Amino acid sequence: MTENFWKRGILRLLPILCLSMAFNAIAQNPCASKEAMVISGNTRFTVLTPEMIRIEYSDKGIFEDRATFAIQNRQMDVVPAFSTGEDNDYLYITTDKLNLKYRKGTNPQTQPASDQNLTITMNHNGTPVIWYPGKTDNQNLKGTCRTLDGCNGDNKRAEMEDGLISRSGWAVIDDSWKVSRADGSHSFALEPNSVVGYDWWSERKDPQALDLYFMGYGHDYKKAIGDFTKIAGKIPLPPAYVFGYWYSRYYSYSADDYREIMREIDKNDIPADVMILDMDWHWNGKASSASENIGGWTGWSWNTNLIPEPTKLLKEIHDNGYKIALNLHPADGIDSIESPSYYNAMSKELNGKYDSNGKIAWYLDYPDFTKSFFKNIIRDHESEGVDFWWLDWQQHLTSPYTSGLGQTFWCNHVFYNDMVKNRKDRRPVIFHRWGGLGSHRYQIGFSGDALINFPTLAFEPYFTSTASNVGYAFWGHDLGGHAFTDEKIVNNPELMLRWIQFGVFTPIFRSHATDDSRIERRIWKFPNFSKLRDAVKLRYALFPYIYTMARETYDTGIGMCRPLYYEYPENEEAYKYEGEYFFGNDILVAPITEPASEDGISRKEIWFPEGNWWSVSTGELINGPCVKTLDFSQDQIPYFFKEGAMIPMNLPTVRNVTAPATSLIINAVAGKEGVGSLYEDSGDNTDYANVYATTAFTHGVKGKTETYTIAPREGDSSGLVERRSWALNVLNAAKPKSVKINGKSLKSSEWKYDADNKTLTINIPETDCSVMTEVKVKY
């Protein structure tokens, strides 16, 4: 049974041609190493990792070696060690983690589901677990869903798709074409297309074939997610500016309105980086937008009644330090009345191929339409100053022209890859809805039209962190909520504040609301504006940490918002307290999502994992593990630094996240050794995979002396500041007996100790970033 299976003549020859992802910025090869494959009749097994095996079955004996919507890469760096064997009836494959048993000559998936033809056995926390195709799992930890449109409280929980991890210890990716995704679409193959210059959908070789990926990672959740991104593609690093504040509102703003908004933002000292122009930028048929009954949800031409000189306005927005995105609802195609010049250009170029009754239908399924559309319309607006696009797809979920082609996923794929190919001067990014597994490759998510109330806010922390279970790491929400059913709460200052405070600790920081004059989203109009602004400034202060964690997401596949059970999988509390999450490696967040008591105080029950946690808002050290109920005023946010952490932050005066960081802060929690880091690049470069720099921080403890080290910057520092000053804030500190920088003792007047807040502040003079700095504090 242990004889190597290759020698038994069962392995078939691979097809000579093994297609690769020719146009992806990151090299991918969807064809696995032949050494990883075991073929038995009409069944093929591919051992991808010790915990992951691909299982294919085709009545025709046809296997798929192209990429699919979900899977991009099967050529792993190393073929994992495994052994094979057989007897008269069964094939056996054994890895370090899995034992597979297959009845030769059968379809692995029986009807109804049973363990008759295929089982995989694994050890999960000391207990054997047996899986077979079709086995149900009620302990899956879920992933995400297409949209929060209509979200009221947690009514969208039931729509959340299965994730890639489970308390059961196993999960399955069913990438079979015949199995519908949540939106009714299917996972097509992808292959290079010479017309558009990137990968295009293609029918599967055998649409009825079985194509499963068994993932038996136990409770090593982070490894499961990380290995998923190895086969499904990395999560691209968004440009730095997307982590700033976005001003966004669905409203009939004129050019002068946008100018006034920018003046008010500047006058009120509000940091901001992105300006969204929602659908009133184009003719949309609304009387309120002076559209003269021209257009509708779909539009491509500027509403010159509102914005008479678009290029001039976009230049002014850029000159004020903003990036610009336009909202698109493209489903209705190109109309000869709404966009006559675009219609005529495309009709001529395509020889009227897609014309019907004065309209070119939305044929994004086809390369010739797509090439003409981007050439004639999208390039034109980008030349005017549009930086990226918001794909607000709300129409039919699957294509009326190609059966099973998901419109959400396909729009995302095409817009993103067009930007990769045709806008090489900037980092590709689009703002879009979840379209199923593989959507993480198009990185920034727009969750949609959630209702304005506290229960909906309470659902979003769970929803955001849980999306990391499918690699969807960059959800952005309508902070403040989108629409309302209760007018009494529509502009509730406390609700708006708590939503914005939650948004500080989410990937994308964007307030938004629907076109209703009763809803206010200009934070300077709220009576608690100073608290709202403080939250925005906290977001900007955290940017160096946030961007560092975004890079970690690219490197590891782990989202910056992550469930507690990633770190504490065997603690029941990590599953129970689903409104808490980790924001990166070192910050625990428990947002306030309920209204305060009559005394204005919010009381929050919080689980603290093992270790000590510094409460930034209240200035106290909390010893975990424990459950505590803490009080928070409305200007306080429950977030906690891990003891030993070293967290890089901006000065509170920063107004743009891309401003040169000539001075930074390190917040370090005294008492325990730890590490931290700072990631830097030029912010919008496409070669960030290799062109970047990092600075390591270490925190050592020896007796009553604590040593904080800023290592020399490593990597490519082209375009980055060469010299920098630092402020080291040591939290939970006693008053020191002595402080030294690089061996030189400081006078007591050269450092500051705040006894009330237990904070020691040491200012480190401007230093070359290539030089190490060491601070020793003796207590």
Question: Which residue stretches match the model-derived regions?
Answer:
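Catalytic core of carbohydrate-active enzymes
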Residues: 417, 438-445, 459-460, 467-477, ...
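Bacterial Sec-dependent N-terminal signal peptides
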Residues: 1-30
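Catalytic and substrate-binding clefts that recognize carbohydrates or anionic sugar/phosphate headgroups
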Residues: 84-239, 249, 255, 262-267, ...
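A low-complexity, Ser/Thr/Gly/Pro-enriched, surface-exposed linker/loop concept
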Residues: 49-88
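Extracellular/luminal ectodomains and secreted, surface-exposed scaffolds of diverse proteins
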Residues: 81-84, 742-770
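A conserved hydrophobic secondary-structure block that centers on an alpha-helix together
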Residues: 153-154, 238-241, 248-287, 295, ...
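Short, well-ordered beta-strand segments enriched in hydrophobic/aromatic residues
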Residues: 45, 53-55, 93-100, 588-591, ...
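Aromatic- and carboxylate-enriched substrate-binding clefts and catalytic-loop regions
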Residues: 114, 123, 131-133, 271-532, ...
